[in-house]
Amino acid sequence: MKIRILTIGQKMPAWVLTGFEDYFKRIQPFVQTQVIELPMAKRGKNDSEADILKYCQIEGESILNALKPNETLIALEVGGRELSTEKLADTMKQWMLEGNDVALAIGGPDGLSDQVRKAAAWHWSLSKLTMPHPLVRILLIEQLYRAMSINHNHPYHRA
């Protein structure tokens, strides 16, 4: 199994890079993980709803074009299914047993396009809270690492 994180946005603040890199390095012994940073559509100051929809469509096309044919697409969005860490660990164990490669899509500041939502095998919510997409990167990689540590009896998860 391989995990690819398809994320909109290429210039992250230093605190995001620091937090993400820590867990990204930790997860590698458990599962091959890759991050694909895709360009965010250029936004204006007073964008209309039509403009925002267009930006989401452009970003959605980037996500779908980056998707490999054998990958299961999972859309991260506030309206998705919530999982406990233990349920995520079970889900990841199943992916590994089935040999599934997984692509996790993180949208830009305006979310994911309808095309990405429709293409996704399922939708996952890290929280009912709305979060900035740079923070989602850190939360996602930490939860993936935590789930893998459960599956490998590593002492990181102590809940």
From Swiss-Prot:
Which keywords appear in this protein's UniProt record, sorted alphabetically? Cytoplasm, Methyltransferase, rRNA processing, S-adenosyl-L-methionine, Transferase
InterPro entries in the record? Alpha/beta_knot_MTases, RlmH-like, tRNA_m1G_MTases_N
Give one Pfam hit by family name: SPOUT_MTase
* Sites where the protein binds S-adenosyl-L-methionine: L76, G107, L126, S127, K128, L129, T130, M131
Q: What is its EC number?
A: 2.1.1.177
Q: Name one GO molecular function term.
A: rRNA (pseudouridine-N3-)-methyltransferase activity
Chief place where the protein resides: cytoplasm
The EC class name is transferase
UniProt key word Cytoplasm: yes
Q: Which reaction does it catalyse?
A: pseudouridine(1915) in 23S rRNA + S-adenosyl-L-methionine = N(3)-methylpseudouridine(1915) in 23S rRNA + S-adenosyl-L-homocysteine + H(+)
Query: A GO CC term?
Result: cytoplasm
Q: SUPFAM superfamilies attached here?
A: alpha/beta knot
The answer to whether the entry has keyword Ubl conjugation is no
Q: Where in the cell is it found?
A: Cytoplasm
Q: Which residues form a coiled coil?
A: none
Write down the NCBIfam families for this protein, in alphabetical order. PRK00103.1-4 (NF000986), tRNA_RlmH_YbeA (TIGR00246)
Q: Which purpose does this protein serve, as stated in its record? A: Specifically methylates the pseudouridine at position 1915 (m3Psi1915) in 23S rRNA.
* Protein family (similarity comment): Belongs to the RNA methyltransferase RlmH family.
The subunit field of the Swiss-Prot or TrEMBL record says:
Homodimer.
Q: Which PANTHER family match?
A: METHYLTRANSFERASE, RIBOSOMAL RNA LARGE SUBUNIT METHYLTRANSFERASE H
Q: What is this protein called in UniProt?
A: Ribosomal RNA large subunit methyltransferase H
